[in-house]
Amino acid sequence: MRIRRNDFGVLTPPELGTWEPTMTVTVVIPAHDCQETLDLTLAALSAQTYPSHLLDVIVVDDGSDPPIEAAGEIVRVRESWGRAAAVQAGLEAATGEVVLVLDADMVPHPEHVEAHLRWHHLAPYLVVLGWIDFTQPPSPPTPAEVAAGVRDLFPMSSHRHDWAEEIIGEHDGLRSAPSSLVSRVHVGATASYPAWLLRACGGMDASLKLAEDTELGYRLTQAGAVFVPDPEARAWHLGLPTAMRSVAELKRYNDPFVADRVPYRRYLRADQGRQWLVPYVDAVVEAGSYEDVRASVDGLLAGSLPDVRVTITGPWEWLTDSRRSPLADPLLDLRLLHAQFTHDPRVRLADPPPGVAPFRLICPPGWMPGHDSVERLVERLEETDGGVLCVALAETPDGVVTARLERTAALSRAALVIRPGEVLDDVLDEVFGVEWVDGADFGFTRRPRLYPPRRRPVPEHERLARQREQELSRLRERAAALRAEVTQLRREAAKGRRDTARWKEKAEQWRREAVRLARERNHTVLTRAVRRVRSLTFPDR
């Protein structure tokens, strides 16, 4: 069965209690100084609906004092300590086709193992996550009470894995979650894995004392796993975990370890110029002409994304110190590349790297990515959650010259499901998606004819930065001139307002004077008219 990205909705698990299991499962329980809760965990496992002849349990005693006691198989960790080391010891001893890791403070419902295993019968690369209900009982039940019935034994706590349930709910039960997010819900308190897949990706990192689930979830993603949370695989968690009791302290402890190992947590890698144990992008350049390879590597290392490691592949074992003509050496280009990059910690002279980084960029020698080319390509692939970006660089008589940005999770998934005779890119397109883009649109250019140039050309990002600075300077000058002009206009406007007020006052004076004069004139005219009338009427007077 082929699953696209994390969309396990193409699978239809059987209803609980209606199917016939065939796969074997080993339940691994890491335990440290927790005999009382472990007894309840084991009692709940004794009452599982999954066939007992297909289920075995391994308790791993992580240095308990007094030592843990249990009826079944016990593995005691002596050379290391911590939960990761305990789970790894249990994995090494496990014989089941599936390994279900269950913490010693978990009390699973009777259908818990069955709910996990019904998925594993459908596809061989699923990681199934149980559903946790927290409880803080005033007094724990006895193992006999647990074996008799788990579902209603405990009062439900108000605490939940809100952040995980929110991610699951917002992404259609995790089916539409992007690759960079999906493994965040990997909580190892109840999780099951194909044993072969867990071993193939390296098992637990025993050097980690906390955050081991986060780191393992990341590596499982790169191995091509599909994560399936099943709300019917329920279990009680007795008490609150450290993640809920000491949030700030746990984050402070985990951040540097997670930052070094999980490139997806970009917010933890905000430090400029830092290098990390696991790079964000593994770039691969095949050895060839010294000038071509150097130009490509220089472009990759000078990019805006510093979280890049470059591997130059070639027959490095051919380089010996036997006598030769230095200038006529048939391996001269290879030797020059070795001399140029052997002491650069960001460059490896080796075979192609294993799939640990989330992205791999294959760049043909002689082609130089621009300052932000790699960063923009990764952003494009993350936006679409695609599997491969094929970057068309040039067309030649031999075909199209391309660079490729590949998602490691997509390559691993395709390798798991490809059939003989199939074309890899066809399978990649089916399980994640393949997209073609124009290299010129992403800043790829052919190297200069002379490389390295005697005078280094100004990098594009510096040229653009200077251009922007010049434009800003011009705009600042223009803004200053406009401010001065506005100030002058304000002054003139204020003067205009004063003049207007003065002229209004004069106009009012003139109006009053005109009224007065008009009245006087009218009075004079009237007086004359009266006199004229009188003289005409009374001529003798």
Features from the language model and the residues they span:
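N-proximal low-complexity "stem/linker" segments adjacent to membrane-targeting elements
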Residues: M1-A44, D255-E291
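Short, acidic, metal-binding catalytic loop of nucleotide-sugar glycosyltransferases
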Residues: A43-L54, D298-D307
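A conserved acidic beta->alpha catalytic loop
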Residues: D61-I68, M106, G314-D329
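Glycine-rich, basic loop-to-helix element that forms the pyrophosphate-binding segment
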Residues: V77-A94, A115, Q340-P352
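Short aromatic/hydrophobic "clamp" motif used to bind/position activated sugar donors
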Residues: V99, R360-I362
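Conserved donor NDP-sugar-binding/catalytic core segment of glycosyltransferases
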Residues: E111-R160, M368-A403
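A recurrent flexible, glycine/aromatic-enriched loop bordering the glycosyltransferase active site
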Residues: M156-S192, G387-V388, T396-A403, R407-E430
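Boundary detector for helix-to-coil junctions that initiate low-complexity/charged tails
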Residues: P452-R541
